[in-house]
Amino acid sequence: ADKIFEETKKIINAFIQRITYVEFLPEILNAETLKNNELNEGIYGYEEFTDPRISNVFSTAAFQFIHSLTPSSIEFDGTETPLMDLFNNQNFLFLDTEKVAVYMMSSAGEPMDRFFSKQLTDHYFQSGNISFDLVAQIIQRGRDHGLPSYNTFRRHCGLPRLPHFYAMEAANVLKAVYHNIDDVDVFVGGMVEIPLPGSLLGPTFSCLIARQFRDTKFGDSHWYESADPKKGFNEGQLKSIKAMSAAKILCDGFGLSLIPENPFRVTSPSNPMVVCADLPGLDFQPWFLLGNQI
């Protein structure tokens, strides 16, 4: 029983790692950033002195970009529901999880830019006439955590320091809020950057996020591509794991019959619906041991 539990946990960890790096990261980072930071599949070697822990700037600022993609409402069973009505309301998740999953895969997020839904800035966890502003909270949290300025992180990433506001997008807006270019918070500066070609993010956030995912990968001795047979997988097992996809897991988990080929994107001519039954599943044959079965 312990062997089954541990091996199952190991397989699930491998799914999470692979789908995150092979399917999700290419949706936010461009090919050059992935290559330069060795985030592509097939490149791995454990680095004993690489710290895999989540950095302050990643969790507090850089990865908070995701909130810009949040829509103002969701449409469920033909009814459009404002996001504010769903905060702290998990009941709808248990009504029909399949419909929620299908909605999330079929509806595009908001554009990645410096603008956020008013549901997050004016009605976040609203109670009566009192609410929070998520963007203000992110900025304040960065200051509470002692994050250096946007320009400091540009230099940290090997990018040139910006000498004045007019080197930035939304210069007039920033100049009205900040006294000095070196006062600009890293979250604010990262959010107003022009995205790199083929990326959702500008150069600073691309750098900070890519470096974090590299550290998480190469600082993990149990990474799914490890050559250590006790920590990784044999050739047949690894081949079986690589055949699995987010689409197949969603199909099996929600009992779907059709799914977008890439569930991280909405359906389009380049991302058609595919039959779930046609997607390869996990082949357990490589886990059958001589005289023993897992």
Curated annotation (Swiss-Prot):
* Glycosylation site list: N129
Q: Which UniProt keywords apply?
A: Glycoprotein, Secreted
A Pfam family per the record: An_peroxidase
Mind listing the GO biological process terms from this record?
Answer: response to oxidative stress
Q: Which Gene3D superfamilies does the record cross-reference, listed alphabetically? A: Haem peroxidase domain superfamily, animal type
Cellular localisation: Secreted
**Reported tissue expression:** Component of the acid-insoluble and acid-soluble organic matrix of calcified layers of the shell (at protein level).
What's the superkingdom here?
Eukaryota
Q: Which family does it belong to?
A: Belongs to the peroxidase family.
Question: Under what name is this protein listed?
Answer: Peroxidase-like protein 3
- State the organism of origin: Lottia gigantea (Giant owl limpet)
Ranked from the top, the taxonomy reads: Eukaryota, Metazoa, Spiralia, Lophotrochozoa, Mollusca
